[in-house]
UniProtKB/Swiss-Prot annotation:
Domain of life: Bacteria
GO molecular function terms noted in the UniProt entry: monoatomic cation transmembrane transporter activity
BP GO annotations: potassium ion transport
Gene3D superfamilies to which the protein is assigned, alphabetical: Regulator of K+ conductance, C-terminal domain
Domain spans labelled RCK C-terminal: 191-275, 277-360
Membrane-protein topology: Multi-pass membrane protein
Membrane spanning residue stretches: 4-24, 28-48, 65-85, 95-115, 157-177, 370-390, 402-424, 438-458, 463-483, 492-512, 529-549
Full protein name: Putative transport protein CGSHiEE_03135
Keyword line: Cell membrane, Membrane, Repeat, Transmembrane, Transmembrane helix, Transport
Main location: membrane
GO cellular component, as recorded: plasma membrane
Similarity-based family: Belongs to the AAE transporter (TC 2.A.81) family. YidE subfamily.
Taxonomic source organism: Haemophilus influenzae (strain PittEE)
Amino acid sequence: MSDIAITISLLALVAVIGLWIGHWKIRGVGLGIGGVLFGGIIVAHFTDQYGLKLDAHTLHFVQEFGLILFVYTIGIQVGPGFFSSLRKSGLKLNAFAILIIVLGSIAVVLVHKIADVPLDIALGIYSGAVTNTPALGAGQQILAELGVPQTTVTMGVSYAMAYPFGICGILLAMWLIRLFFNVKVDDEAARFNAESSQDKESLHNISLKVTNQNLDGLTLIQIPGFSDEEVVCSRLKRDDMEIVPKASTEIRTNDILQLVGDDNSLAKMRLIIGYEVDAPTVAYSGEIRSERVVVTNEKVLGKKIRALGIHQKYGVVISRLNRAGIELVPTGNTTLQFGDVLHMVGRSDVLNQAISVIGNAQQKLLQVQMLPVFIGIGLGVLVGSIPFYIPGFPVALKLGLAGGPLVVVLILARIGTIGKLYWFMPPSANLALREIGIVLFLAVVGLKSGGSFFDTLVNGSGLEWMGYGIFITFVPLIIAGTIARLYGKLNYLTICGLLAGSMTDPPALAFANEIKEDNGAAALSYATVYPLVMFLRIMSPQLLAVLLWAA
Protein backbone atom coordinates (compact mmCIF):
# COMPACT_ATOMS: atom_id res chain seq x y z
CA MET A 1 0.00 0.00 0.00
CA SER A 2 1.10 3.56 -0.67
CA ASP A 3 1.73 6.00 2.16
CA ILE A 4 -1.42 7.92 1.20
CA ALA A 5 -3.56 4.75 1.29
CA ILE A 6 -2.12 3.78 4.68
CA THR A 7 -2.74 7.29 6.01
CA ILE A 8 -6.38 7.40 4.91
CA SER A 9 -7.01 3.88 6.23
CA LEU A 10 -5.59 4.82 9.62
CA LEU A 11 -7.68 8.01 9.69
CA ALA A 12 -10.80 5.88 9.20
CA LEU A 13 -9.63 3.52 11.96
CA VAL A 14 -9.05 6.48 14.29
CA ALA A 15 -12.56 7.78 13.58
CA VAL A 16 -14.14 4.40 14.33
CA ILE A 17 -12.21 3.86 17.58
CA GLY A 18 -12.61 7.49 18.66
CA LEU A 19 -16.35 7.67 18.08
CA TRP A 20 -16.74 4.38 19.94
CA ILE A 21 -14.78 5.78 22.89
CA GLY A 22 -16.86 8.96 22.73
CA HIS A 23 -20.03 6.95 23.29
CA TRP A 24 -18.78 5.61 26.62
CA LYS A 25 -20.61 7.37 29.44
CA ILE A 26 -20.15 7.50 33.20
CA ARG A 27 -23.27 8.80 34.94
CA GLY A 28 -24.46 10.24 31.65
CA VAL A 29 -21.23 12.12 30.92
CA GLY A 30 -18.82 11.11 28.17
CA LEU A 31 -16.05 12.49 25.97
CA GLY A 32 -18.37 12.85 22.99
CA ILE A 33 -16.59 13.90 19.83
CA GLY A 34 -13.43 14.44 21.90
CA GLY A 35 -13.04 10.67 21.95
CA VAL A 36 -11.65 10.90 18.40
CA LEU A 37 -8.58 12.69 19.76
CA PHE A 38 -7.89 9.83 22.15
CA GLY A 39 -8.58 7.31 19.39
CA GLY A 40 -5.85 9.03 17.38
CA ILE A 41 -3.47 8.93 20.32
CA ILE A 42 -4.01 5.17 20.77
CA VAL A 43 -3.53 4.41 17.05
CA ALA A 44 -0.45 6.67 16.85
CA HIS A 45 1.14 4.84 19.77
CA PHE A 46 1.03 1.56 17.83
CA THR A 47 1.98 3.07 14.46
CA ASP A 48 5.16 4.38 16.08
CA GLN A 49 5.91 0.96 17.54
CA TYR A 50 5.42 -0.82 14.20
CA GLY A 51 7.19 1.87 12.18
CA LEU A 52 4.29 2.71 9.86
CA LYS A 53 4.96 5.83 7.81
CA LEU A 54 2.16 8.35 7.34
CA ASP A 55 2.02 10.88 4.51
CA ALA A 56 2.60 14.31 6.07
CA HIS A 57 1.02 16.27 3.19
CA THR A 58 -2.18 14.22 3.35
CA LEU A 59 -2.41 14.69 7.11
CA HIS A 60 -1.86 18.44 6.79
CA PHE A 61 -4.57 18.83 4.13
CA VAL A 62 -7.10 16.68 6.01
CA GLN A 63 -6.47 18.61 9.23
CA GLU A 64 -6.94 22.04 7.64
CA PHE A 65 -9.91 21.03 5.49
CA GLY A 66 -11.62 19.42 8.48
CA LEU A 67 -11.18 22.60 10.49
CA ILE A 68 -12.58 24.74 7.65
CA LEU A 69 -15.63 22.47 7.28
CA PHE A 70 -16.31 22.56 11.01
CA VAL A 71 -15.97 26.32 11.36
CA TYR A 72 -18.05 26.97 8.24
CA THR A 73 -20.98 24.85 9.42
CA ILE A 74 -20.81 26.41 12.88
CA GLY A 75 -21.11 29.83 11.25
CA ILE A 76 -24.08 28.73 9.15
CA GLN A 77 -25.78 27.41 12.28
CA VAL A 78 -25.26 30.40 14.55
CA GLY A 79 -25.14 33.17 11.92
CA PRO A 80 -28.85 34.06 11.82
CA GLY A 81 -28.95 34.35 15.63
CA PHE A 82 -25.48 35.83 16.19
CA PHE A 83 -26.35 39.50 15.89
CA SER A 84 -29.79 39.14 17.48
CA SER A 85 -28.11 37.52 20.52
CA LEU A 86 -26.33 40.83 21.09
CA ARG A 87 -29.60 42.67 21.54
CA LYS A 88 -30.66 44.02 24.90
CA SER A 89 -32.40 40.79 25.94
CA GLY A 90 -29.13 38.90 25.84
CA LEU A 91 -26.68 41.57 26.95
CA LYS A 92 -26.42 40.44 30.56
CA LEU A 93 -25.90 36.78 29.68
CA ASN A 94 -23.37 37.60 26.97
CA ALA A 95 -21.55 39.93 29.38
CA PHE A 96 -21.10 37.07 31.86
CA ALA A 97 -19.98 34.77 29.04
CA ILE A 98 -17.37 37.35 28.00
CA LEU A 99 -16.27 37.56 31.64
CA ILE A 100 -15.63 33.79 31.66
CA ILE A 101 -13.57 34.07 28.47
CA VAL A 102 -11.58 37.04 29.82
CA LEU A 103 -10.88 35.27 33.12
CA GLY A 104 -9.78 32.16 31.22
CA SER A 105 -7.45 34.28 29.09
CA ILE A 106 -5.97 35.88 32.21
CA ALA A 107 -5.41 32.39 33.63
CA VAL A 108 -3.47 31.48 30.47
CA VAL A 109 -1.28 34.56 30.88
CA LEU A 110 -0.57 33.59 34.50
CA VAL A 111 0.28 30.01 33.54
CA HIS A 112 2.59 31.23 30.77
CA LYS A 113 4.33 34.00 32.73
CA ILE A 114 4.44 32.73 36.32
CA ALA A 115 4.70 28.97 35.73
CA ASP A 116 6.95 29.56 32.71
CA VAL A 117 4.93 27.21 30.50
CA PRO A 118 5.83 27.56 26.78
CA LEU A 119 3.29 29.51 24.74
CA ASP A 120 2.25 26.63 22.47
CA ILE A 121 1.66 24.31 25.43
CA ALA A 122 -0.24 27.03 27.35
CA LEU A 123 -2.57 27.58 24.39
CA GLY A 124 -3.06 23.82 23.99
CA ILE A 125 -3.99 23.52 27.67
CA TYR A 126 -6.36 26.48 27.27
CA SER A 127 -8.12 24.88 24.26
CA GLY A 128 -8.55 21.58 26.10
CA ALA A 129 -9.61 23.22 29.35
CA VAL A 130 -12.46 25.04 27.59
CA THR A 131 -13.27 21.94 25.45
CA ASN A 132 -13.13 24.01 22.26
CA THR A 133 -11.46 22.28 19.34
CA PRO A 134 -11.66 25.25 16.91
CA ALA A 135 -9.62 27.20 19.48
CA LEU A 136 -6.92 24.54 19.14
CA GLY A 137 -6.93 24.92 15.36
CA ALA A 138 -6.86 28.71 15.58
CA GLY A 139 -3.95 28.61 18.03
CA GLN A 140 -1.97 26.27 15.78
CA GLN A 141 -2.61 28.54 12.81
CA ILE A 142 -1.37 31.73 14.46
CA LEU A 143 1.68 30.07 16.04
CA ALA A 144 2.65 28.70 12.64
CA GLU A 145 2.42 32.26 11.30
CA LEU A 146 4.67 33.40 14.14
CA GLY A 147 7.22 30.75 13.23
CA VAL A 148 6.78 28.35 16.15
CA PRO A 149 7.71 24.82 14.92
CA GLN A 150 5.90 21.54 15.66
CA THR A 151 2.85 23.18 17.26
CA THR A 152 0.53 20.35 16.19
CA VAL A 153 2.35 17.83 18.38
CA THR A 154 2.88 19.93 21.52
CA MET A 155 -0.52 21.63 21.43
CA GLY A 156 -2.27 18.34 20.68
CA VAL A 157 -0.69 16.60 23.67
CA SER A 158 -1.40 19.47 26.09
CA TYR A 159 -4.95 19.76 24.72
CA ALA A 160 -5.52 16.05 25.41
CA MET A 161 -4.18 16.39 28.96
CA ALA A 162 -6.61 19.19 29.83
CA TYR A 163 -9.68 17.98 27.91
CA PRO A 164 -11.18 15.38 30.30
CA PHE A 165 -11.43 17.75 33.27
CA GLY A 166 -12.64 20.46 30.90
CA ILE A 167 -15.84 18.42 30.59
CA CYS A 168 -16.06 17.37 34.25
CA GLY A 169 -15.11 20.82 35.57
CA ILE A 170 -18.24 22.45 34.15
CA LEU A 171 -20.46 19.89 35.88
CA LEU A 172 -18.54 20.32 39.14
CA ALA A 173 -18.95 24.10 38.95
CA MET A 174 -22.73 23.74 38.49
CA TRP A 175 -22.92 21.41 41.48
CA LEU A 176 -20.82 23.64 43.77
CA ILE A 177 -22.83 26.77 42.93
CA ARG A 178 -26.02 24.86 43.74
CA LEU A 179 -24.49 23.68 47.03
CA PHE A 180 -23.01 27.04 48.02
CA PHE A 181 -26.21 29.02 47.46
CA ASN A 182 -28.49 26.24 48.77
CA VAL A 183 -30.51 26.31 45.55
CA LYS A 184 -33.94 24.67 45.42
CA VAL A 185 -34.35 23.64 41.80
CA ASP A 186 -38.17 23.54 41.83
CA ASP A 187 -38.31 27.10 43.17
CA GLU A 188 -35.87 28.27 40.49
CA ALA A 189 -37.95 26.62 37.77
CA ALA A 190 -41.14 28.23 39.07
CA ARG A 191 -39.45 31.65 39.22
CA PHE A 192 -38.16 31.28 35.66
CA ASN A 193 -41.62 30.30 34.37
CA ALA A 194 -43.19 33.29 36.14
CA GLU A 195 -40.61 35.72 34.76
CA SER A 196 -40.89 34.24 31.27
CA SER A 197 -44.64 34.72 31.18
CA GLN A 198 -44.16 38.39 32.09
CA ASP A 199 -41.19 39.18 29.87
CA LYS A 200 -41.93 37.01 26.85
CA GLU A 201 -41.44 38.96 23.64
CA SER A 202 -43.20 36.59 21.26
CA LEU A 203 -46.24 37.71 19.28
CA HIS A 204 -49.82 37.38 20.49
CA ASN A 205 -53.36 37.46 19.05
CA ILE A 206 -56.13 39.58 20.49
CA SER A 207 -59.57 40.62 19.24
CA LEU A 208 -60.70 44.21 19.80
CA LYS A 209 -64.19 45.63 19.37
CA VAL A 210 -64.23 49.06 17.72
CA THR A 211 -65.85 51.41 20.25
CA ASN A 212 -63.96 54.60 19.39
CA GLN A 213 -66.48 56.68 17.40
CA ASN A 214 -63.67 58.69 15.81
CA LEU A 215 -62.57 55.62 13.84
CA ASP A 216 -65.94 55.10 12.13
CA GLY A 217 -65.47 55.46 8.37
CA LEU A 218 -61.67 55.53 8.44
CA THR A 219 -59.69 53.05 6.37
CA LEU A 220 -57.45 50.58 8.15
CA ILE A 221 -54.27 52.33 7.02
CA GLN A 222 -55.48 55.64 8.50
CA ILE A 223 -55.60 54.23 12.04
CA PRO A 224 -52.42 54.79 14.10
CA GLY A 225 -50.55 51.55 14.66
CA PHE A 226 -51.55 50.09 11.30
CA SER A 227 -49.94 52.98 9.46
CA ASP A 228 -46.75 52.42 11.50
CA GLU A 229 -46.93 48.67 10.77
CA GLU A 230 -46.54 47.90 14.48
CA VAL A 231 -49.39 45.37 14.32
CA VAL A 232 -51.16 43.32 11.65
CA CYS A 233 -54.93 42.94 11.31
CA SER A 234 -55.45 39.36 10.16
CA ARG A 235 -59.28 39.30 10.22
CA LEU A 236 -62.29 41.57 10.51
CA LYS A 237 -65.73 40.41 11.68
CA ARG A 238 -68.79 42.56 10.97
CA ASP A 239 -72.10 41.10 12.09
CA ASP A 240 -72.07 37.56 10.60
CA MET A 241 -69.54 38.39 7.88
CA GLU A 242 -65.84 37.64 8.28
CA ILE A 243 -63.18 38.99 5.88
CA VAL A 244 -59.45 39.49 5.55
CA PRO A 245 -59.17 43.29 5.56
CA LYS A 246 -57.04 45.32 3.18
CA ALA A 247 -55.37 48.64 3.87
CA SER A 248 -58.29 50.36 2.10
CA THR A 249 -61.02 48.53 4.08
CA GLU A 250 -63.31 50.97 5.94
CA ILE A 251 -63.77 50.36 9.65
CA ARG A 252 -67.17 50.67 11.34
CA THR A 253 -68.17 50.94 14.96
CA ASN A 254 -68.73 47.50 16.56
CA ASP A 255 -66.43 45.76 14.06
CA ILE A 256 -64.25 43.12 15.70
CA LEU A 257 -60.61 43.16 14.59
CA GLN A 258 -58.17 40.32 15.23
CA LEU A 259 -54.70 41.80 15.69
CA VAL A 260 -51.23 40.25 15.86
CA GLY A 261 -48.29 42.00 17.54
CA ASP A 262 -46.14 42.22 20.63
CA ASP A 263 -47.61 43.11 24.03
CA ASN A 264 -46.63 46.79 23.97
CA SER A 265 -48.07 47.42 20.51
CA LEU A 266 -51.29 45.57 21.34
CA ALA A 267 -51.69 47.59 24.54
CA LYS A 268 -51.51 50.81 22.48
CA MET A 269 -54.14 49.48 20.08
CA ARG A 270 -56.51 48.79 23.00
CA LEU A 271 -56.38 52.49 23.88
CA ILE A 272 -57.00 53.53 20.27
CA ILE A 273 -59.66 51.03 19.15
CA GLY A 274 -61.65 49.70 22.09
CA TYR A 275 -61.98 46.83 24.52
CA GLU A 276 -60.89 43.22 24.11
CA VAL A 277 -63.41 40.47 23.33
CA ASP A 278 -63.12 36.70 23.20
CA ALA A 279 -65.32 35.89 20.22
CA PRO A 280 -63.18 35.31 17.13
CA THR A 281 -59.70 34.68 18.54
CA VAL A 282 -59.65 30.94 17.87
CA ALA A 283 -62.17 29.66 15.35
CA TYR A 284 -61.85 30.33 11.62
CA SER A 285 -64.92 30.36 9.45
CA GLY A 286 -65.27 27.95 6.57
CA GLU A 287 -64.23 30.62 4.05
CA ILE A 288 -61.14 31.82 5.91
CA ARG A 289 -58.20 29.67 6.93
CA SER A 290 -54.62 30.10 8.01
CA GLU A 291 -51.47 28.27 6.93
CA ARG A 292 -47.82 28.15 7.97
CA VAL A 293 -45.82 28.59 4.78
CA VAL A 294 -42.06 28.23 4.27
CA VAL A 295 -40.28 30.56 1.83
CA THR A 296 -38.63 28.30 -0.78
CA ASN A 297 -39.34 30.03 -4.12
CA GLU A 298 -36.03 31.44 -5.36
CA LYS A 299 -37.88 34.19 -7.27
CA VAL A 300 -39.05 35.89 -4.06
CA LEU A 301 -35.75 35.68 -2.15
CA GLY A 302 -34.42 39.11 -1.25
CA LYS A 303 -37.69 40.81 -2.22
CA LYS A 304 -39.79 42.95 0.10
CA ILE A 305 -43.24 41.71 1.07
CA ARG A 306 -44.76 44.87 -0.40
CA ALA A 307 -43.19 44.15 -3.80
CA LEU A 308 -44.90 40.75 -3.98
CA GLY A 309 -48.34 42.35 -3.78
CA ILE A 310 -49.84 39.31 -2.05
CA HIS A 311 -52.27 41.40 -0.02
CA GLN A 312 -53.39 43.44 -3.02
CA LYS A 313 -53.71 40.49 -5.45
CA TYR A 314 -55.17 37.83 -3.18
CA GLY A 315 -56.39 39.65 -0.07
CA VAL A 316 -54.07 37.45 2.02
CA VAL A 317 -52.44 38.78 5.19
CA ILE A 318 -49.01 37.70 6.44
CA SER A 319 -49.58 38.01 10.18
CA ARG A 320 -46.33 36.52 11.54
CA LEU A 321 -42.81 35.76 10.37
CA ASN A 322 -40.47 33.31 12.09
CA ARG A 323 -36.79 33.59 11.17
CA ALA A 324 -34.22 31.34 12.83
CA GLY A 325 -36.58 30.82 15.77
CA ILE A 326 -37.28 34.53 16.25
CA GLU A 327 -40.83 35.80 15.73
CA LEU A 328 -41.19 39.12 13.91
CA VAL A 329 -44.09 41.37 12.92
CA PRO A 330 -43.84 41.41 9.11
CA THR A 331 -44.07 44.81 7.44
CA GLY A 332 -44.15 45.85 3.82
CA ASN A 333 -40.41 46.52 3.99
CA THR A 334 -39.51 43.09 5.40
CA THR A 335 -37.16 41.22 3.05
CA LEU A 336 -37.82 37.51 2.65
CA GLN A 337 -35.06 34.93 3.17
CA PHE A 338 -34.97 31.24 2.34
CA GLY A 339 -36.45 29.22 5.19
CA ASP A 340 -38.57 32.04 6.65
CA VAL A 341 -41.83 30.67 8.05
CA LEU A 342 -44.86 32.86 7.32
CA HIS A 343 -48.27 32.67 8.99
CA MET A 344 -50.72 33.52 6.18
CA VAL A 345 -54.45 34.16 6.56
CA GLY A 346 -56.92 34.46 3.69
CA ARG A 347 -59.95 33.09 1.86
CA SER A 348 -59.71 29.39 1.09
CA ASP A 349 -60.25 29.84 -2.65
CA VAL A 350 -57.24 32.17 -3.11
CA LEU A 351 -54.90 31.21 -0.26
CA ASN A 352 -53.35 28.35 -2.24
CA GLN A 353 -52.49 30.76 -5.06
CA ALA A 354 -50.69 33.03 -2.60
CA ILE A 355 -48.87 30.04 -1.09
CA SER A 356 -47.61 29.02 -4.54
CA VAL A 357 -45.96 32.43 -4.87
CA ILE A 358 -44.02 31.89 -1.62
CA GLY A 359 -43.09 28.31 -2.45
CA ASN A 360 -43.70 26.04 0.53
CA ALA A 361 -41.83 23.21 -1.24
CA GLN A 362 -40.87 21.07 1.72
CA GLN A 363 -38.44 18.96 -0.31
CA LYS A 364 -36.29 22.06 -0.96
CA LEU A 365 -35.67 22.35 2.77
CA LEU A 366 -33.88 19.00 2.57
CA GLN A 367 -31.60 20.02 -0.30
CA VAL A 368 -28.16 21.61 0.07
CA GLN A 369 -27.24 24.35 -2.39
CA MET A 370 -23.54 23.58 -2.86
CA LEU A 371 -22.53 26.72 -4.77
CA PRO A 372 -22.92 29.03 -1.73
CA VAL A 373 -20.98 26.52 0.39
CA PHE A 374 -17.87 26.78 -1.76
CA ILE A 375 -18.30 30.53 -2.25
CA GLY A 376 -18.37 30.93 1.53
CA ILE A 377 -15.37 28.65 2.07
CA GLY A 378 -13.36 30.33 -0.70
CA LEU A 379 -14.09 33.85 0.53
CA GLY A 380 -13.39 32.76 4.11
CA VAL A 381 -9.96 31.37 3.25
CA LEU A 382 -9.13 34.55 1.29
CA VAL A 383 -10.23 36.83 4.14
CA GLY A 384 -8.35 34.66 6.62
CA SER A 385 -5.17 35.08 4.56
CA ILE A 386 -5.28 38.88 4.45
CA PRO A 387 -2.66 40.37 6.80
CA PHE A 388 -3.46 43.45 8.85
CA TYR A 389 -0.90 45.36 10.82
CA ILE A 390 -1.18 46.69 14.37
CA PRO A 391 1.56 49.04 15.64
CA GLY A 392 3.82 47.37 18.18
CA PHE A 393 3.06 43.82 17.09
CA PRO A 394 5.96 41.77 15.71
CA VAL A 395 3.99 40.22 12.85
CA ALA A 396 0.93 41.00 10.79
CA LEU A 397 -2.26 39.49 12.16
CA LYS A 398 -4.43 37.13 10.12
CA LEU A 399 -7.79 35.58 10.90
CA GLY A 400 -6.42 32.31 9.54
CA LEU A 401 -8.29 29.24 8.34
CA ALA A 402 -10.37 29.18 11.53
CA GLY A 403 -11.27 32.85 11.88
CA GLY A 404 -11.63 33.80 8.20
CA PRO A 405 -14.37 31.34 7.21
CA LEU A 406 -16.16 31.97 10.51
CA VAL A 407 -16.33 35.76 10.07
CA VAL A 408 -17.36 35.51 6.41
CA VAL A 409 -20.07 32.91 6.95
CA LEU A 410 -21.50 34.77 9.97
CA ILE A 411 -22.06 37.75 7.69
CA LEU A 412 -23.38 35.66 4.79
CA ALA A 413 -25.75 33.69 7.04
CA ARG A 414 -27.01 36.96 8.50
CA ILE A 415 -27.62 38.39 5.00
CA GLY A 416 -29.26 35.09 4.10
CA THR A 417 -29.87 35.67 0.40
CA ILE A 418 -27.97 37.24 -2.48
CA GLY A 419 -29.89 36.87 -5.73
CA LYS A 420 -30.74 33.19 -6.14
CA LEU A 421 -27.99 32.14 -3.72
CA TYR A 422 -29.03 31.45 -0.14
CA TRP A 423 -26.89 30.54 2.84
CA PHE A 424 -29.22 28.01 4.38
CA MET A 425 -28.38 24.42 5.23
CA PRO A 426 -30.78 21.75 6.51
CA PRO A 427 -29.95 20.89 10.13
CA SER A 428 -29.21 17.25 9.25
CA ALA A 429 -26.78 18.23 6.49
CA ASN A 430 -25.16 20.86 8.70
CA LEU A 431 -24.67 18.36 11.50
CA ALA A 432 -23.22 15.75 9.13
CA LEU A 433 -20.67 18.13 7.61
CA ARG A 434 -19.79 19.54 11.02
CA GLU A 435 -19.20 16.09 12.49
CA ILE A 436 -17.12 15.01 9.50
CA GLY A 437 -15.00 18.16 9.76
CA ILE A 438 -14.28 17.88 13.47
CA VAL A 439 -13.63 14.12 13.24
CA LEU A 440 -11.05 14.66 10.48
CA PHE A 441 -9.36 17.47 12.40
CA LEU A 442 -9.20 15.61 15.72
CA ALA A 443 -8.09 12.38 14.06
CA VAL A 444 -5.04 14.11 12.58
CA VAL A 445 -4.25 15.95 15.82
CA GLY A 446 -4.42 12.65 17.69
CA LEU A 447 -2.21 10.86 15.17
CA LYS A 448 0.40 13.63 15.25
CA SER A 449 0.52 13.94 19.03
CA GLY A 450 -0.03 10.32 20.06
CA GLY A 451 3.58 9.26 19.79
CA SER A 452 4.65 11.49 22.67
CA PHE A 453 1.43 11.46 24.72
CA PHE A 454 2.12 8.49 27.00
CA ASP A 455 5.77 9.45 27.50
CA THR A 456 4.72 12.99 28.49
CA LEU A 457 2.07 11.65 30.85
CA VAL A 458 4.34 9.12 32.59
CA ASN A 459 7.79 10.69 32.42
CA GLY A 460 7.14 14.32 31.53
CA SER A 461 4.99 17.25 32.64
CA GLY A 462 1.61 15.69 31.82
CA LEU A 463 0.21 15.76 35.36
CA GLU A 464 1.43 19.33 35.80
CA TRP A 465 -0.37 20.35 32.61
CA MET A 466 -3.54 18.69 33.92
CA GLY A 467 -3.29 20.89 37.01
CA TYR A 468 -3.00 24.02 34.89
CA GLY A 469 -6.00 22.84 32.86
CA ILE A 470 -8.08 22.43 36.02
CA PHE A 471 -7.13 25.99 37.02
CA ILE A 472 -8.11 27.42 33.61
CA THR A 473 -11.40 25.48 33.54
CA PHE A 474 -12.59 25.81 37.08
CA VAL A 475 -11.64 29.25 38.40
CA PRO A 476 -13.37 31.38 35.69
CA LEU A 477 -16.57 29.31 35.94
CA ILE A 478 -16.80 29.54 39.72
CA ILE A 479 -16.03 33.29 39.79
CA ALA A 480 -18.48 34.17 37.00
CA GLY A 481 -21.17 31.82 38.33
CA THR A 482 -20.91 33.31 41.82
CA ILE A 483 -21.07 36.89 40.52
CA ALA A 484 -24.01 36.02 38.25
CA ARG A 485 -25.93 34.58 41.20
CA LEU A 486 -24.89 37.07 43.86
CA TYR A 487 -24.95 40.36 41.95
CA GLY A 488 -26.61 39.53 38.64
CA LYS A 489 -29.52 37.78 40.43
CA LEU A 490 -29.66 35.20 37.65
CA ASN A 491 -31.77 32.09 37.93
CA TYR A 492 -29.70 29.01 38.81
CA LEU A 493 -30.96 27.07 35.78
CA THR A 494 -30.05 30.02 33.57
CA ILE A 495 -26.56 30.06 35.11
CA CYS A 496 -26.14 26.36 34.28
CA GLY A 497 -26.97 27.04 30.63
CA LEU A 498 -24.63 30.04 30.69
CA LEU A 499 -21.73 27.94 32.02
CA ALA A 500 -22.34 25.21 29.41
CA GLY A 501 -22.64 27.79 26.64
CA SER A 502 -19.48 29.61 27.70
CA MET A 503 -17.61 26.34 27.06
CA THR A 504 -19.69 25.48 23.94
CA ASP A 505 -20.12 22.07 25.55
CA PRO A 506 -23.24 20.04 24.51
CA PRO A 507 -22.68 17.31 27.18
CA ALA A 508 -22.75 20.03 29.83
CA LEU A 509 -26.00 21.37 28.35
CA ALA A 510 -27.49 17.87 28.48
CA PHE A 511 -26.51 17.67 32.15
CA ALA A 512 -28.02 21.13 32.82
CA ASN A 513 -31.28 20.15 31.10
CA GLU A 514 -31.54 17.03 33.26
CA ILE A 515 -31.44 19.14 36.44
CA LYS A 516 -35.03 20.16 35.62
CA GLU A 517 -36.18 18.32 32.52
CA ASP A 518 -39.42 20.19 31.86
CA ASN A 519 -37.81 23.64 32.06
CA GLY A 520 -36.17 25.47 29.14
CA ALA A 521 -34.07 27.97 31.10
CA ALA A 522 -30.73 26.23 30.56
CA ALA A 523 -31.28 25.66 26.83
CA LEU A 524 -32.38 29.27 26.33
CA SER A 525 -29.32 30.81 27.99
CA TYR A 526 -27.03 28.32 26.21
CA ALA A 527 -28.46 29.34 22.83
CA THR A 528 -28.23 33.03 23.74
CA VAL A 529 -24.50 33.03 24.47
CA TYR A 530 -23.36 30.26 22.10
CA PRO A 531 -22.89 32.33 18.90
CA LEU A 532 -20.77 35.07 20.49
CA VAL A 533 -18.83 32.61 22.64
CA MET A 534 -17.93 30.40 19.67
CA PHE A 535 -16.62 33.45 17.83
CA LEU A 536 -14.59 34.66 20.82
CA ARG A 537 -13.25 31.18 21.63
CA ILE A 538 -11.79 31.01 18.12
CA MET A 539 -10.36 34.54 18.23
CA SER A 540 -9.03 34.53 21.82
CA PRO A 541 -6.11 32.09 21.33
CA GLN A 542 -4.98 34.11 18.33
CA LEU A 543 -5.00 37.35 20.33
CA LEU A 544 -3.28 35.66 23.27
CA ALA A 545 -0.61 34.23 20.97
CA VAL A 546 0.22 37.58 19.42
CA LEU A 547 0.13 39.52 22.71
CA LEU A 548 2.27 37.01 24.60
CA TRP A 549 4.65 36.60 21.67
CA ALA A 550 5.15 40.36 21.53
CA ALA A 551 5.56 40.71 25.31
